[in-house]
């Protein structure tokens, strides 16, 4: 309303549907009376800005199709990644890897499957632990490095109940500045996120690090990973485990897919590219 009263253009950063995320997180029931009210309020807010920026084409289509926003007002600018910070095995690769595995007392002969992000059910962590049990049963040389918070104790108990506690390490919270070296110490990355209404920025960090990546299939995952990603059936831990096992058993495939994803990240998702797109939007509005 301040922008309207001063007659200055307003740009809205759309991170996902409020109603859809409240339903995803279980804050309200789909049949609640609040559902219609929240949808009405959200729609009104979405119609206020001169331009809306989304982090994926999927989110752009949601605004156009579900909220009837004019296509010319909605611009998809993907989440971006610092491809200079997130690199494949930065610095002295063996030294960095050794530092990480020594820090967490992981046997140095294991292949690491990494996850970096929030620990929550909607992020698919229970599915990841179920998949880990299947993977470790078939490939005892695998180790899962699960980086993030909260809920560490909850998921640790889940891993213990599966009998895989010696093959799963929970690091807790990792600072942004430590994230590149932690990811570079891993061999495979995984993102079992279930929500289709949000972005999935962790995929870009994986890609920039040159990690072969397995994700649950979805529009956002395919938009980011392209043809070089591996897509498991959503919510199916057996499918997730199968894709991880295929990568564990083929070093050449891991290298090829990781290199391809790194190239894609640099070409399409770098900070420089995103900065340029944002600059052009603001310039357009200032000239109106």
Protein language model regions, located:
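Conserved acidic donor-binding segment of nucleotide-sugar-dependent glycosyltransferases
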Residues: 229-238, 246-252
């Amino acid at each position: 309303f301040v922008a309207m009263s001063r007659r200055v253009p307003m740009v809205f950063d759309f991170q996902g549907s409020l109603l859809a995320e409240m339903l995803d997180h279980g804050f309200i029931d789909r049949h609640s009376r609040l559902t219609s009210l929240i949808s009405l309020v959200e729609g009104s807010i979405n119609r206020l800005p001169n331009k809306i920026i989304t982090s994926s084409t999927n989110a752009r289509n949601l605004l156009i199709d579900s909220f009837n926003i004019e296509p010319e007002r909605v611009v998809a600018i993907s989440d971006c990644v610092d491809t200079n910070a997130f690199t494949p095995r930065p610095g002295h690769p063996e030294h960095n890897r050794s530092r990480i595995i020594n820090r967490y007392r992981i046997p140095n002969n294991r292949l690491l499957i990494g996850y970096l992000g929030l620990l929550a059910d909607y992020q698919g962590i229970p599915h990841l632990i179920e998949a880990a049990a299947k993977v470790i049963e078939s490939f005892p040389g695998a180790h899962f490095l699960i980086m993030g918070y909260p809920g560490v104790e909850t998921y640790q108990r889940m891993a213990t109940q599966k009998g895989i506690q010696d093959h799963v390490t929970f690091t807790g919270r990792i600072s942004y500045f430590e994230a590149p070296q932690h990811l570079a110490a891993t061999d495979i990355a995984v993102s079992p996120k279930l929500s289709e209404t949000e972005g999935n920025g962790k995929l870009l960090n994986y890609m920039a690090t040159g990690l072969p990546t397995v994700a649950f299939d979805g529009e956002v995952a395919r938009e980011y990973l392209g043809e070089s990603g591996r897509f498991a059936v959503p919510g199916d831990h057996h499918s997730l485990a199968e894709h991880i096992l295929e990568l564990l058993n083929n070093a050449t495939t891991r290298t090829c897919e990781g290199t391809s994803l790194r190239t894609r990240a640099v070409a399409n998702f770098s900070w420089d590219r995103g900065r340029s797109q944002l600059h052009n939007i603001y310039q357009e509005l200032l000239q109106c």
